[in-house]
Amino acid sequence: MSQTLLDSLNQKELTETSCTIEIQAAFILSSLATFFGGLIILFLFRIALKSSRSWKYVKGPRGLLELFSSRRIEANPLRKLYFHGVFRQRIEMLLSAQTVVGQVLVILVFVLSIGSLVIYFINSMDPVRRCSSYEDKIVHVDLSFNAFFSFYFGLRFWAAEDKIKFWLEMNSIVDIFTIPPTFISYYLKSNWLGLRFLRALRLLELPKILQILQVIKTSNSVKLSKLLSIVISTWFTAAGFLHLVENSGDPWLNGRNSQTMSYFESIYLVTATMSTVGFGDVVAKTSLGRIFIVFFTLGSLILFANYIPEMVELFSTRKKYTKPYEAVKGKKFIVVCGNITVDSVTAFLRNFLHWKSGEINIEIVFLGETLPCLELETLLKCHTSCTNFVCGTALKFEDLKRVAVENSEACLILANHFCSDLHDEDNSNIMRVLSIKNYYPQTRVIIQILQSQNKVFLSKIPNWDWSAGDNILCFAELKLGFIAQGCLVPGLCTFLTTLFIEQNQKVFPKHPWQKHFLNGLKNKILTQRLSNDFVGMTFPQVSRLCFVKLNLMLIAIQHKPFFHSCCTLILNPSSQVRLNKDTLGFFIADSSKAVKRAFFYCSNCHSDVCNPELIGKCNCKIKSRQQLIAPTIMVMKSSLTDFTTSSHIHASMSTEIHTCFSREQPSLITITTNRPTTNDTVDDTDMLDSSGMFHWCRAMPLDKVVLKRSEKAKHEFQNHIVVCVFGDAQCTLVGLRNFVMPLRASNYTRQELKDIVFIGSLEYFQREWRFLRNFPKIHIMPGSALYMGDLIAVNVEQCSMCVILATPYKALSSQILVDTEAIMATLNIQSLRITSPTPGSSKSEVKPSSAFDSKERKQRYKQIPILTELKNPSNIHFIEQMGGLDGMLKGTSLHLSTSFSTGAVFSDTFLDSLLATSFYNYHVVELLQMLVTGGISSEMEHYLVKEKPYKTTDDYEAIKSGRTRCKLGLLSLDQTVLSGINPRKTFGQLFCGSLDNFGILCVGLYRMIDEEEPSQEHKRFVITRPSNECHLLPSDLVFCAIPFNTTCGKSDSSPSIQAQNNSTNATTPLAQGSNFFDSHHADESHDLYPVDDTGERWSQHHHSRVYPLDTLDASDIVQEK
């Protein structure tokens, strides 16, 4: 009995181990025969199909040919429609998981593939060379799985467009090398592992299955699942191959070098090989195994080095940047969203953290829509104490909740200046504002806008509140406003820029002028509440006291008149305005510590203090408060016009004003004064827009302003402004309206307005013209600034300034090339040399010449004044070389270049710093916008957008029109009213004398670089806020804030007559064949740039007609888009 049982066990063991090489070869050859046989058959049918096309009639069944072809025979369309339009379409929908049945089918195939792989793992516990008996139940389960795989393979084969391509797909190869051996095992009544490890490649379908089941939804989850499936399937497949060859041995040695290696040991070997080069405890002994390890090591270097770290990063980053920001009570923070890149974050942190000089008390939370790159992550780590990054978007409430917007101090939105579509960039940022305001209406929002016409939509957003600190920084408006000021007053563009840039680079000046310029760079516009000891004093008195006693330059105040509740900014107000309690003052100073002296000043304690540094907070308890009882404002009825613009006008002051507002018929507001008039004719009537801020004219057709080169003698321009624009029919609009508006400000008389001549593509100006058609004295010359003939045709040699605007953004490989056209145009214009007119000649002569002529030639010719805009500040070295300057201020910074110090170049890169300025002190930005945009404030703009009618008295309408606001200009020391100031050896003496006698506020100097070697081309540089002890030179020009009704001509006898003779703008010098610089160089016969044409206070514009500028319609934006 026992002997019979022993024999039975021995027979079973013999049956399980008797898997000969012939049986193994049968399993392998079945797969190879299926693969290559099927491939040959497909190629033969493809060849037969192509051969049949040469026959007129094809004999035999056609459906079989179509089945194996990648194309279709066009006969019998009804049959094709039936088989391939119905049945085939349903199969494709099943296989693509577009239906519920298809999704179930795909999931079922994946689950059965994993089940077949599990069966392989179970069978791999036995030696590879042992064949399992067919009586094993697991074999029947595996056979049923493979039968289903065969059915699925047939469906895929039927639905495939290209059968040969399908045959070579990875999933097809897996089925071909795993399904046939299963049926062979049924015939041989034995089962062998063989190549069934290839089922592990089905794990690559894992991301698709998880998406169907909606387990993963985010892009990071999909990416992580793909990486994970690639790594795992590679491990299992490589381990299966090693398990097979190491247990079977090399075929040519009949397996004599085989070794027993479990599947787990194979996975261990593969893992060790991927991560390092193995540890030597488990190694491959067969030649096939070692060859496989060699190639697998090379592939694993790529796989492990790229995929594994990326997976780890996804695991850690997802948790790190998706968790909500925890707002700590008492800790202030802001949210920054929009364009979050390395460059934008770098610029923002540099400007934002500078305000507190290293003292960090506000945390910055960046809300980025994508995970930070390595460079940005490194930057954030350098500021880890004050920065946080959260991945999300401001368009979703859940992301806004994660960054706790409702608890933030403000939400700042960054714009991408280098985007290809400025309109889309603005629209996306406007949508962010709308989302933030809808989520929490009280959130303070500061946004960067690229195009000024898009500001209209922000004012219409519910809960937008200017008074709560909501602010708009429009780059096009500010940039072109700066350039326009540089056209009105040479050097003013640089003067204003120096007040907002921060110079941290150490520079060692070699020349005296460099020292003066660098000292000016230290000054900034700062604000400070004024001491209540100044209450009741006039602005000139306070400004003089601050200058002499406190060593501070007070230039403007925020004033609150008694007849309405709003505050308005006033630059250099007249003596009729007296200070109220807690008046906000605007200073040009070098530190916030210095301006605090204006707050601490006490008339009792500091009256005898001579050193401004000693003025600090005093312990005075009892002060004389008689000034507090004094009237806050003392205004003469005849002097109402001395007030400046206010944004809120009460309707209760309305009298006898006839207004008519409509889009088709512009509004007409006629202002009539009761003052005595002379020569009151219709020709003298000025037309203004509805705000009274800008000169207006009826819409002009474009063809009326287009100039022809052949009619040069017909339009002999002099003292005009030439603007070179590089644009075409497809590029983004620059927004020339923002450039023209400051040049058409109403505080200049109609006679003072200079002609503006644009040179550029006519197709481009056709797109811009609807924004410019209501401004007077605008002309267009079709052509290019790169063509000398077009420049000469517009009398560029007689212009007061030639502006070269940068090319609209283009996607280029190098950022150096963005300024190519601007640099070449600058070179083209600088090559022109203008001879000074001889005594017998009334016109100057233009001659092309090299920019590097001898010194004698430089003395004979003069250059055309140029202001070039650069998008890339590093391109300044091209301008320096062409300007003939030797780069005496060494350094790569544009703001340290000689060209910048002379006012010859401008770049808007510093405007990024205004975002931080607007957050800490939005009053400074308000003043800047008022200075560079022609006097309009954000609150006034709110009314302009709505076209809200003003119903006021006649006198106050004159105030509202803004015509009485100060003008910035240049005055010479000898040929203007400044010549009557004595003594005036130092800037301090000049400041006090001009303020006391004329109400003129001196703020800076425009000085010659080399006084000892004067020439026609001599350059001047800007000195911002000179020191009180700065000695003046006879050739100095003075930057001044000049009251509207002040006569600036040198007075010898009658003021009114002298005003008509001497108070001129720069038209006169250029009309005589010279330019602004020559007028002060040769004999300095002309004084002011610019001044009024009228001399007496009461005779300013007896009749003024006011019209609205055409407001931007949303349809125009859509049409332009």
Swiss-Prot record:
| Annotated RCK N-terminal domain residues | 331-473, 718-889
Which terms are listed as keywords in the entry? Cell membrane, Cytoplasm, Ion channel, Ion transport, Membrane, Potassium, Potassium channel, Potassium transport, Transmembrane, Transmembrane helix, Transport, Voltage-gated channel
Explain what switches its activity on or off, per the activity regulation comment. Answer: Regulated by changes in cytosolic pH; activated by alkalization. In contrast to human KCNU1 is not activated by Ca(2+) or Mg(2+). The auxiliary subunit LRRC52 shifts the activation of KCNU1 to more negative potentials at a given pH.
Q: Which reaction does it catalyse?
A: K(+)(in) = K(+)(out)
Q: Which residues span the membrane? A: 25-45, 102-122, 138-158, 166-186, 189-209, 227-247, 291-311
Extracellular-side segments: 1-24, 123-137, 187-188, 248-259, 283-290
**Database matches in Gene3D superfamilies:** 1.10.287.70, NAD(P)-binding Rossmann-like Domain
Q: Which InterPro entries match?
A: Ion_trans_dom, K_chnl_BK_asu, K_chnl_Slo-like, RCK_N, Slowpoke-like_C
Which residues lie toward the Cytoplasmic compartment? 46-101, 159-165, 210-226, 312-1121
Per the UniProt entry, what are the Gene Ontology biological process annotations, in alphabetical order? establishment of localization in cell; fertilization; potassium ion transport; protein stabilization; reproductive process
GO molecular-function term, one example from the UniProt record: potassium channel activity
Annotated knockout phenotype: Mutant males are infertile due to abnormal sperm physiology with no overtly abnormal nonreproductive phenotypes detected. Sperm cells from these mutant mice exhibit several functional defects, such as absence of hyperactivated motility, lack of capacitation-associated membrane hyperpolarization and are unable to respond to acrosome reaction induction.
Q: Where is this region: Disordered?
A: 836-858, 1052-1076
Q: Which residues lie within the membrane without crossing it?
A: 260-282
Q: Does the keyword Kinase apply?
A: no
Q: Which PANTHER family would you find in this protein's record?
A: CALCIUM-ACTIVATED POTASSIUM CHANNEL ALPHA CHAIN, POTASSIUM CHANNEL SUBFAMILY U MEMBER 1
Provide the domain comment.
The S4 segment, which is characterized by a series of positively charged amino acids at every third position, is part of the voltage-sensor. The pore-forming domain (also referred as P region) is imbedded into the membrane, and forms the selectivity filter of the pore. It contains the signature sequence of potassium channels that displays selectivity to potassium.
What name does the UniProt record give this protein?
A: Potassium channel subfamily U member 1
